[in-house]
């Protein structure tokens, strides 16, 4: 099973890139994790935010692997504990499909992206910088994989 993190936004700060790379490397023992950065839509004075979100959505949909199980990161999505995420990962592995996790832009996901998702996952009600969400998702995927492998990383 391969995993693709499709994230709207480019040019992550070095601390995000370094942290993501660390969890990407650790996770590679169990599951390859690929980061695909989507160019954000144009925003600003006089620009239509909905149009920017729809443009991002088209780029996200184009980046989806064929037949992947798609999980959209979304505030109203299903909250999961680390243990529940590990259970979901075990279920996804059993399906034999690749995974795609989607992180939207400032206004969230386009409606078409949410329709294409197999499920949505909320990492909590806090408003977080999208770059930080990349790091949190990578760490939680590593934690879940480590739990499934009986690795001592997770201590709860």
From Swiss-Prot:
Positions annotated to bind S-adenosyl-L-methionine: 73, 104, 123-128
EC number of the protein: 2.1.1.177
Pfam families given in the database record: SPOUT_MTase
Gene Ontology CC: cytoplasm
Enzymatic reactions: pseudouridine(1915) in 23S rRNA + S-adenosyl-L-methionine = N(3)-methylpseudouridine(1915) in 23S rRNA + S-adenosyl-L-homocysteine + H(+)
Keywords: Cytoplasm, Methyltransferase, rRNA processing, S-adenosyl-L-methionine, Transferase
Alphabetized Gene3D superfamilies for the sequence: 3.40.1280.10
Major subcellular site: cytoplasm
A single MF term (Gene Ontology): rRNA (pseudouridine-N3-)-methyltransferase activity
Keyword ATP-binding included in the entry's annotation: no
Compartments (UniProt record): Cytoplasm
Oxidoreductase in keyword set: no
Assembly notes: Homodimer.
Function, in words: Specifically methylates the pseudouridine at position 1915 (m3Psi1915) in 23S rRNA.
Entries under PANTHER family matching the protein: METHYLTRANSFERASE, RIBOSOMAL RNA LARGE SUBUNIT METHYLTRANSFERASE H
Protein family membership: Belongs to the RNA methyltransferase RlmH family.
Name of the protein in question: Ribosomal RNA large subunit methyltransferase H
Species this protein is from: Xanthomonas euvesicatoria pv. vesicatoria (strain 85-10) (Xanthomonas campestris pv. vesicatoria)
């Amino acid at each position: 099973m391969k995993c693709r993190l499709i994230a709207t936004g480019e040019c992550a700060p070095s601390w995000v890139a370094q942290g993501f790379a660390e969890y990407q490397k650790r996770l590679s023992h169990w599951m390859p994790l690929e980061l695909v950065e989507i160019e954000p839509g144009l925003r600003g004075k006089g620009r239509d935010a909905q149009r920017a979100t729809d443009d991002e959505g088209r780029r996200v949909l184009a980046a989806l692997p064929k037949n992947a199980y798609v999980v959209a990161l979304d505030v109203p999505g299903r909250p999961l504990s680390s243990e529940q995420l590990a259970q979901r990962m075990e279920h996804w592995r059993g399906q034999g499909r690749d995974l795609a996790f989607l992180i939207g832009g400032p206004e969230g996901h386009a409606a078409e992206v949410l329709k294409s998702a197999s499920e949505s996952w909320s990492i909590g009600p806090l408003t977080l910088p999208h770059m930080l969400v990349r790091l949190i998702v990578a760490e939680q995927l590593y934690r879940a994989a480590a739990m499934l492998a009986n690795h001592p990383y997770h201590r709860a």
